[in-house]
Amino acid sequence: MLFTDYMANFLVGYFSVLSSIMPLLAETSSTGEGLKLLGAGVAIIGVAGAGIGQGAVGQGACMAIGRNPEMAPKITSTMIIAAGIAESGAIYALVVAILLIFVA
């Protein structure tokens, strides 16, 4: 079988599946519903910032423990507090996104 035959079979199968799914993808809600979900997606961007912040905190703690192993317990406790503060922003972003999806 030639490559063109494989491609023809693939395209026929792809478009047959696509034609059966397209009616299900038709617009069934208002623009407000879409904007609400878009706002929830924008709100969840705050989670990425919290992840970057926690990564920076962990990196700094590992570097500090590597330079001064005797201070490991104090550095670890400070790192956990800083990670908790960074995580609070992610929790707030998640709460806002959930409120936008289910309440607004």
Curated annotation (Swiss-Prot):
One of its GO terms (molecular function) is proton-transporting ATP synthase activity, rotational mechanism. The keyword Membrane applies. It is a multi-pass membrane protein. GO terms for cellular component: plasma membrane; proton-transporting ATP synthase complex; proton-transporting two-sector ATPase complex, proton-transporting domain. SUPFAM superfamilies: F1F0 ATP synthase subunit C. It holds the Pfam family ATP-synt_C. It is found in: Cell membrane. The record marks E87 as: Reversibly protonated during proton transport. It comes from the Bacteria. InterPro entries: ATP_synth_F0_csu, ATP_synth_F0_csu_DDCD_BS, ATP_synth_F0_csu_sf, ATPase_proteolipid_c-like_dom, F/V-ATP_Csub_sf. The keyword Transmembrane applies. The chain crosses the membrane at residues 37-57, 83-103. Keywords: ATP synthesis, Cell membrane, CF(0), Hydrogen ion transport, Ion transport, Lipid-binding, Membrane, Transmembrane, Transmembrane helix, Transport. F(1)F(0) ATP synthase produces ATP from ADP in the presence of a proton or sodium gradient. F-type ATPases consist of two structural domains, F(1) containing the extramembraneous catalytic core and F(0) containing the membrane proton channel, linked together by a central stalk and a peripheral stalk. During catalysis, ATP synthesis in the catalytic domain of F(1) is coupled via a rotary mechanism of the central stalk subunits to proton translocation. F-type ATPases have 2 components, F(1) - the catalytic core - and F(0) - the membrane proton channel. F(1) has five subunits: alpha(3), beta(3), gamma(1), delta(1), epsilon(1). F(0) has three main subunits: a(1), b(2) and c(10-14). The alpha and beta chains form an alternating ring which encloses part of the gamma chain. F(1) is attached to F(0) by a central stalk formed by the gamma and epsilon chains, while a peripheral stalk is formed by the delta and b chains. Belongs to the ATPase C chain family. This is ATP synthase subunit c. The lineage of its organism: Bacteria, Bacillati, Mycoplasmatota, Mollicutes, Entomoplasmatales.
